[in-house]
């Protein structure tokens, strides 16, 4: 399994880091078989798997439950788990309780938190306690209401400079990596050059140290539309619908199950069951 040290070496050597979300045992198992470097159990599971309109309703219990499943499916892959909405915008003591629960109960190797400002002290607090933290700047979905929707961040010089400052503060606080979401590629490149920790981009262009995508977006599974920054490498959705539709048809027309899908009794047992009459 790759570790924080390996990711730093990959950045130094110019080897891109691959990260993919996973929310359950089978998706994690497939991600590990495909040799993904990191798995992110994102609170995006609230929208992708649980059907919420945002990530806000996701709880600490949800993150623990799903991370445990992912851990069972990917025993040899570095796993990062999101701290959900409001689980770290409380006192540092309460934050530690939530962080400890996620790490101890789920087996996550690192936690991800969004934003800067007061979150910088949270990163430092968790790091000092021995919990690796991945920072997340740019478009931060938990704060989408404050940001005015799902919009590109850092498009003007002033806000870009603020993001650069925040990125440096995250590194100084002890973050082991930084996710940059929906920022101009020029800004992402500049931040990547000024940090020693790896940057993982999602909608941040090519000049970052790694990329992350949502599992379901990548394979077109259960999604109606995807953001501009997503490339769909395959489409399993059409095949799944086709297979289920065929199942429905065959049941309705009594083509399924066939004899080969059924179990039988020995002839003498049948005779006994039916009282000698068949």
Swiss-Prot record:
Q: Name one Pfam family in it.
A: Pantoate_transf
Q: Which locations, inside or outside the cell, does it occupy?
A: Cytoplasm
Q: Has keyword Hydrolase?
A: no
Q: Which UniProt keywords apply?
A: Cytoplasm, Magnesium, Metal-binding, Pantothenate biosynthesis, Transferase
Check the record and name the InterPro entries matching this protein: Pantoate_hydroxy_MeTrfase, Pyrv/PenolPyrv_kinase-like_dom, Pyrv_kinase-like_dom_sf
Entry EC no(s): 2.1.2.11
Q: What processes does the entry annotate via GO biological process terms?
A: pantothenate biosynthetic process
Q: What is its main location?
A: cytoplasm
Binding of Mg(2+) occurs at 43, 82, 114
Q: Does the keyword Protein biosynthesis apply?
A: no
Pathway per the UniProt entry? Cofactor biosynthesis; (R)-pantothenate biosynthesis; (R)-pantoate from 3-methyl-2-oxobutanoate: step 1/2
For this UniProt entry, the molecular function terms from Gene Ontology, in alphabetical order, are:
3-methyl-2-oxobutanoate hydroxymethyltransferase activity; magnesium ion binding
Active site annotation, chain numbering:
181
Give the source's domain of life in one word.
Bacteria
Q: Which cofactor does it need?
A: Mg(2+)
CDD domains in the record: KPHMT-like
Which GO cellular component term is one of those annotated? cytoplasm
Note on how the cofactor is bound: Binds 1 Mg(2+) ion per subunit.
Q: Which residues bind 3-methyl-2-oxobutanoate?
A: 43-44, 82, 112
The entry assigns this protein to a family as follows: Belongs to the PanB family.
**What this chain does, per the record?**
Catalyzes the reversible reaction in which hydroxymethyl group from 5,10-methylenetetrahydrofolate is transferred onto alpha-ketoisovalerate to form ketopantoate.
**How does this chain assemble?**
Homodecamer; pentamer of dimers.
Protein name, per record: 3-methyl-2-oxobutanoate hydroxymethyltransferase
Please name the source species. Answer: Bacillus cereus (strain ATCC 14579 / DSM 31 / CCUG 7414 / JCM 2152 / NBRC 15305 / NCIMB 9373 / NCTC 2599 / NRRL B-3711)
């Amino acid at each position: 399994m790759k570790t924080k040290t390996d990711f730093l070496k990959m950045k130094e050597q110019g080897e891109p880091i691959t990260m993919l979300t996973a929310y359950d045992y089978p998706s994690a198992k497939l991600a590990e078989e495909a040799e993904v470097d990191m798995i992110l159990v994102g609170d995006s599971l609230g929208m992708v798997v649980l059907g919420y309109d945002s990530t806000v309703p996701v709880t600490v219990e949800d993150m623990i439950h799903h991370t445990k499943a992912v851990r069972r499916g990917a025993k040899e892959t570095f796993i990062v788990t999101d701290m959900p909405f409001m689980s770290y915008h409380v006192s540092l003591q309460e934050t530690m309780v939530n962080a400890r629960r996620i790490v101890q109960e789920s087996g996550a190797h690192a936690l991800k938190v969004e934003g800067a400002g007061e979150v910088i002290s949270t990163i430092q607090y968790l790091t000092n306690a021995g919990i690796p933290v991945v920072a997340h700047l740019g478009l931060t979905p938990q704060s989408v209401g404050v940001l005015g929707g799902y919009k590109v961040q850092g498009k003007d010089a002033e806000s870009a400079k603020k993001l650069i400052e925040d990125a440096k503060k995250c590194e100084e606080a002890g973050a082991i990596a930084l996710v940059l979401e929906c920022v101009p590629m020029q800004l992402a490149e500049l931040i990547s050059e000024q940090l020693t920790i790896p940057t993982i981009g999602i909608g941040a262009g090519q000049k970052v140290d790694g990329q992350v995508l949502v599992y379901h977006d990548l394979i077109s599974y259960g999604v109606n539309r995807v953001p501009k920054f997503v490339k769909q490498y395959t489409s399993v959705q059409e095949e799944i619908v086709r297979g289920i539709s065929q199942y429905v048809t065959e049941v309705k027309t009594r083509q399924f199950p066939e004899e080969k899908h059924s179990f039988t009794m020995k002839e003498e047992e049948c005779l006994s069951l039916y009282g000698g009459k068949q």
